[in-house]
Amino acid sequence: MPKMKSKKSLAKRVIAKKNGTLKRGKAYRSHRATGKTTKQKRHLEKATIVHVTDMKRIKGLLQK
C-alpha cells in the first residue's frame, strides 16, 4: 500500500510544537486592514494554538 500523503496546503499553515500542540497564524490580517484599529492589527500578528476540538482532525490531515 502506498504511503499516506499529508495535505500540503495545511502543512504550510501549521507548525507542530514539541508538546504536540499545533501553532497557526490568525486570519483577517492580510488586506482591508484600514478599518481595524492598531490594537486589533497588532494582536492579529501573533500566532495562536489550534483549538483542542480541531486538533484530532488536523493531525489526521497532517499524518502526525
UniProtKB/Swiss-Prot annotation:
Pfam families associated with the record: Ribosomal_L35p
Organism: Mesoplasma florum (strain ATCC 33453 / NBRC 100688 / NCTC 11704 / L1)
GO biological process: translation
Recorded family membership: Belongs to the bacterial ribosomal protein bL35 family.
Record has Ribonucleoprotein as a keyword: yes
Keyword Ribosomal protein: yes
GO-annotated molecular function: structural constituent of ribosome
Phylogenetic classification of the source organism: Bacteria, Bacillati, Mycoplasmatota, Mollicutes, Entomoplasmatales
Region (Disordered): 1-43
Record Gene3D superfamilies: 4.10.410.60
Record's keyword terms, sorted: Ribonucleoprotein, Ribosomal protein
InterPro entries given in the database record: Ribosomal_bL35, Ribosomal_bL35-like, Ribosomal_bL35_CS, Ribosomal_bL35_sf
Protein name: Large ribosomal subunit protein bL35
Gene Ontology cellular-component terms listed: cytosolic large ribosomal subunit
